[in-house]
Amino acid sequence: LPEAQLDRFLMQVNIDYPAVEDELKIVQLVREENKKMLLQQGQEESVGREPSKIREPLISQHQVMQARREVLDQYMSPEVERYMVELVQATRTPERYHQELSEWIEWGGSPRASLALDRCAKAHAWLLERDFVSPEDLQQIAPDVLRHRILLSYTAESRGMDADEVIRRILELVPVP
């Protein structure tokens, strides 16, 4: 996809294959769920009802909306907010931070990158049951949010670098509040 379309994705999360034990658990869980579903359909058919195709939700729509409100209400101090924007600025004007960065980045993140960092950092803090965003939240989610928004230079690619390495370097160079 062109950069402008890639930028519309909130995150690019890299997921490894599960370990053998984890994959065994997945197989066993899915097998049990399938058995439960078949059993439920059989019971419904025996009483003359059409088998259910819609399962009961694990959480209600109200709970989802409440969680979204709580995420949006996460506090981000002006210093952390500035740090967040500086991380994105470092992808656009890398020479301000280090000459090597400017040799590695052809194209940096747009304002959507800052918006995505804001949303994801707040969600990350909420998942950790905090009511504020810390620089560590931004550092944790920065690779997933920025990796598809940075176009590496030929120099970086010829050295075998990837976006995650460049982001790690940005996180080292941008001063943390």
Language-model regions, residue ranges each:
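Conserved AAA+ ATPase core "coupling" helix
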Residues: 1-69, 78-86
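Active-site/binding-pocket entry motifs
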Residues: 33, 90-93
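C-terminal engagement/docking regions of AAA+ P-loop ATPases
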Residues: 66, 75-78, 92-177
